[in-house]
Amino acid sequence: MTLPDGLLLRGFVDRLDVAPDGALRVVDYKTGAVPREAFEGKALFQMKFYALVLWRTRGVVAAQLKLLYLKDGDALTYAPDEGELLRFERTLIAIWAAIERAVATGDFRPNKTRLCDWCDHQAFCPAWGGTPPPFPVEAAAAAGWPTLPIVEVG
């Protein structure tokens, strides 16, 4: 699906249930445990993405978004509405605009979080004092990618 600004959206839904009245339920299976309440919003980002695509392609707002966590058998469910999907669409467009600005300027600042403690790429990450490998200029040119300037992050 392509948004009005040209952003192409694509994803793979694990399961789409259709009720006799046509109501849709989007289901995604997760191998871990249900997240704490503080992290539910991040967990539902993917599901809102699917709901937006369904709404824009079928004209139907999913009645329910459901994440099923196989580790503990718990589920996280959510019922979006049209207004929220419009806000989410604007959020996606803003995120994409930020990515395009980063590509245009070469400014990809790392976002250091607690998850970084387990990352195998710390030696390459400026947030950890690492040095990224050189950009593969020849491969990028062959693929038609723009060459990006190097921006030091301090």
Language model features: what each stretch is:
Residues M1-G154:
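RecB-family 4Fe-4S metal-dependent nuclease core
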